[in-house]
């Protein structure tokens, strides 16, 4: 938890906003409105980020190119479509702490997860288990179990779960490492979230990778709630792969194209088994339409089809805002915003709610998960009627996230006032 001495009162929130060097970025997004026309208090960037105001213009630009150029837009549009996805490569690499050749923007998260497991989950008689956290996002669990089934194995014996201690909600680092040390020789793949979607816990990805590699395990991460939220250094940490979506903290829009990281020790090995498609074929000979697949070097060699330009355009708009704001500045503000929210909630301590997200800022991002012992989902609905947008996760968790690109300290203050009144 940050040591900044937060004060109560609306004046303090206004003072924090007045000296916030990132405050003006709020004006580059479209906040939902209440029925009376006021901006909502939008604390749901962990579920769907706000629309950048430039997104519509970027989409319209490509629609005009399509109308005016037809197929020639692939080569002669102002932003030619053939290499369009590469406009995002440098920005994406910086965002996740990777080298440009290690990342590609493509598909959706679960599709990319299947592609990665096709290459990296290679079970043997002795090493066949997949380690996941209990409470992982259901799509990950479905994908993992289906891969185990596909290989003719039994999920009951091949799926290994990390669980928190009794009466705790988050995993302890020492328990994760101990399990890997104990079971590692039978684990083929460690697949964990960078940030758990339910609790908001950020995992020690560097430590997990080190422990996994020490035991000979492949290590991968689902960064759906981490990309654009917490600092990442994927190349230096050394996991084998990672996947993420782009519609949460990255503000790419509903169902936006996802991203994929393949560490360079694998990315430049075209002989690595994979599911192939024509867009992953060496671009120098792609249009010769030959019968044999020759993978491109780098993460681009896992591409299947040509990218959807109209879906990439809003992501490009958002990534340019990230570049202008600076990742270090965004993280610094995020730590303060979340610490401020936690501090204000603590001033309204009640047996009716508790924060289950870790208190240490190194172990969380923007999200706070609030466990309710009364009211339940009806509280979330009542707050929505008052212009406060968070979200509910069964059985008892209300999730909120103050996103540094577009949330203010006054947003946080007003939320806590309305929440504390609603929970009484």
Regions found by a protein language model. Give the residues of each.
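Pyridoxal 5′-phosphate
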Residues: 1-424
């Amino acid at each position: 938890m940050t040591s900044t001495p937060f004060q109560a009162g609306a004046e303090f929130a206004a003072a924090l906003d007045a000296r916030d060097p990132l405050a003006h970025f709020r004006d580059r997004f479209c906040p939902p409105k209440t029925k009376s026309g006021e901006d909502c208090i939008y604390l749901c960037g962990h579920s769907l980020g706000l629309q950048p105001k430039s997104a519509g213009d970027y989409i319209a630009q490509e629609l005009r190119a399509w109308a005016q150029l037809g197929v020639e837009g692939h080569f002669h549009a102002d932003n030619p479509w053939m290499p369009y996805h590469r406009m995002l490569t440098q920005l994406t690499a910086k965002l996740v702490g990777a080298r440009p050749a290690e990342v590609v923007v493509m598909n959706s998260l679960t599709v990319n997860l299947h592609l990665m497991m096709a290459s990296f989950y290679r079970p043997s008689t002795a090493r066949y288990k997949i380690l996941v956290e209990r409470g992982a996002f259901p799509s990950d669990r479905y994908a993992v179990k289906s891969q185990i089934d596909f290989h003719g194995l039994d999920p009951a014996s091949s799926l290994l779960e990390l669980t928190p201690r009794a009466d705790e909600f988050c995993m302890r680092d020492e328990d994760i490492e101990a399990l890997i040390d104990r079971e590692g020789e039978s684990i083929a793949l460690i697949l964990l979230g960078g940030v758990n979607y339910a609790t908001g816990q950020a995992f020690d990805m560097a430590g997990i990778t080190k422990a996994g590699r020490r035991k000979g395990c492949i290590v991968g991460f689902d960064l759906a709630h981490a990309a654009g939220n917490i600092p990442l250094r994927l190349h230096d940490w050394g996991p084998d792969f990672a996947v993420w979506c782009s519609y949460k903290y990255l503000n790419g829009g509903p169902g936006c194209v996802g991203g994929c990281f393949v560490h360079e020790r694998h990315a430049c090995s075209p002989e690595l088994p994979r599911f192939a498609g024509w867009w992953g074929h060496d671009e120098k000979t792609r249009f010769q339409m030959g019968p044999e697949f020759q993978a491109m070097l780098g993460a681009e060699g896992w591409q299947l089809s040509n990218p959807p330009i109209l879906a990439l355009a809003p992501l490009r708009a958002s990534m340019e805002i990230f570049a202008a704001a600076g990742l270090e500045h965004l993280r610094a503000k995020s730590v303060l915003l979340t610490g401020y929210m936690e501090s204000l909630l603590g001033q309204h301590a009640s047996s009716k709610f508790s924060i289950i997200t870790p208190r240490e800022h190194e172990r969380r991002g923007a999200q706070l998960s609030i466990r309710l012992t009364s009211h339940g989902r009806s509280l979330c609905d009542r707050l929505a009627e008052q212009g406060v947008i968070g979200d509910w996760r069964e059985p008892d968790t209300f999730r909120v996230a103050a996103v540094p690109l577009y949330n203010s300290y006054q947003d946080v203050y007003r939320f806590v006032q309305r929440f504390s009144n609603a929970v009484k």
